[in-house]
């Protein structure tokens, strides 16, 4: 039995980062860019690869504006045309795959057509699996130059095994997302201790980690970086925008958009044993403004960390507060 779990469990609302002496005059002088794979992106944020968060039109805009993205895998027949379209535009292609037998045929077809997506994400709810490891090895054999992320996982053992199999990055988070009810349906997951799980996994990781799920505030991005994330995947906070998929719904004069989990009835198309739910999120206007605000808040975080670049956040001290940070507002 692992002894990793003797550590104290905590999550985003339980943590406050401690400021260091500032060295920049304005937050505008702080550099939020991050290298992930062979490319450098504006901020360490990626919209969740969910059908209610990302589509091809938004993927084009993100790539054109130096943001990382991962296209969802729920319309598999559109993946090859999507890769071709992105490459024709001179943009990078970033796709998701599962572990069904048909996905091996898909990888073979990519090789046959000489299509080489720059980024591939193996997107499985329980990523610490012999079948995920098998898929990692197959993709790295067939498409060795594609940057391969695998997940989702929750433990250091999983990080080690997926990295050893050939994954270039691992995605940490089992069920902490707002539209995910894995923790309620199964009793398993990182809900309530996602940030501690990230910290634990970062201690053994030799390759980048993506923190996936549980982000509720812009400051949580900085906290994720502090505890080892190279990239932060965000769902509900990047849903509900003008550019987001999903229908616009008006209720009592207020505007909402649909948002649903990747294992919900909406996504599956019929009732099965689901681990996601559908909800409405407030309409938020343009995603450009939200991403700009995230960058500005991250620049402020870098200033508080006493640095000029993103990595300075990793060096700050922190406290685990006795009660969560919002108790003082009551």
Curated annotation (Swiss-Prot):
EC number(s) given by UniProt: 1.7.1.7
GO cellular component, one term: cytosol
Annotated keywords: NADP, Oxidoreductase
Gene3D superfamilies referenced in this protein's UniProt entry, alphabetically: Aldolase class I
Binding site for NADP(+): 209-232
Catalytic residue positions: 180
Matches recorded under InterPro entries: Aldolase_TIM, GMP_reductase, GuaC_type_2, IMP_DH/GMP_Rdtase_CS, IMP_DH_GMPRt
GO biological process: purine nucleotide metabolic process
Catalytic activity of the protein: IMP + NH4(+) + NADP(+) = GMP + NADPH + 2 H(+)
Origin superkingdom: Bacteria
SUPFAM superfamilies xrefs: Inosine monophosphate dehydrogenase (IMPDH) (SSF51412)
Gene Ontology MF, one: GMP reductase activity
Cited function: Catalyzes the irreversible NADPH-dependent deamination of GMP to IMP. It functions in the conversion of nucleobase, nucleoside and nucleotide derivatives of G to A nucleotides, and in maintaining the intracellular balance of A and G nucleotides.
Family, similarity comment: Belongs to the IMPDH/GMPR family. GuaC type 2 subfamily.
Protein known as: GMP reductase
Origin species: Lactobacillus acidophilus (strain ATCC 700396 / NCK56 / N2 / NCFM)
């Amino acid at each position: 039995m692992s002894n990793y779990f003797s550590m104290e469990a905590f999550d985003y609302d339980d943590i406050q980062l401690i400021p260091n002496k500032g060295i920049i005059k304005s937050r505008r002088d702080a550099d939020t860019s991050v290298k992930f794979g062979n490319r450098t992106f504006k901020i360490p944020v990626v919209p969740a690869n969910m059908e209610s968060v990302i589509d091809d039109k938004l993927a084009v805009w993100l790539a054109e504006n130096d943001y990382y993205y991962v296209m969802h895998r729920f319309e598999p027949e559109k993946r090859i045309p999507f890769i071709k379209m992105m490459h024709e535009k001179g943009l990078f292609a970033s796709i998701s795959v599962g572990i069904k037998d048909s996905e091996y045929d898909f990888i073979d077809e990519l090789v046959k057509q000489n299509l080489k997506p720059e980024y591939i994400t193996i997107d499985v709810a329980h990523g610490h699996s012999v079948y995920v490891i098998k898929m990692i090895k197959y993709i790295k054999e067939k498409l060795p130059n594609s940057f391969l992320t695998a997940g989702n996982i929750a433990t250091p053992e999983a990080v080690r095994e997926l990295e050893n199999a050939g994954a270039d990055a691992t995605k940490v988070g089992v069920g902490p997302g707002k539209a995910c009810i894995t923790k309620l349906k199964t009793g398993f997951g990182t809900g309530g201790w996602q940030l501690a799980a990230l910290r634990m996994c970062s201690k053994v990781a030799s390759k980048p980690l993506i923190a996936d799920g549980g982000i509720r505030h812009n400051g949580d991005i900085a906290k994720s970086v502090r505890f080892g994330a190279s990239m932060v995947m965000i769902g509900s906070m990047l849903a509900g925008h003008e550019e987001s998929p999903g229908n616009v719904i008006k209720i009592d004069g207020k505007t909402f958009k649909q948002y649903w989990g990747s294992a919900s009835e909406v996504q599956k198309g019929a009732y099965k044993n689901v681990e996601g739910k559908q909800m409405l999120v407030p309409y938020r206007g343009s995603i450009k403004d939200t991403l700009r605000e995230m960058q500005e808040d991250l620049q402020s975080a870098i200033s508080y960390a006493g640095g000029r670049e993103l990595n300075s956040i990793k060096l700050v001290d922190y406290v685990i507060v006795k009660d969560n940070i919002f108790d003082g507002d009551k």
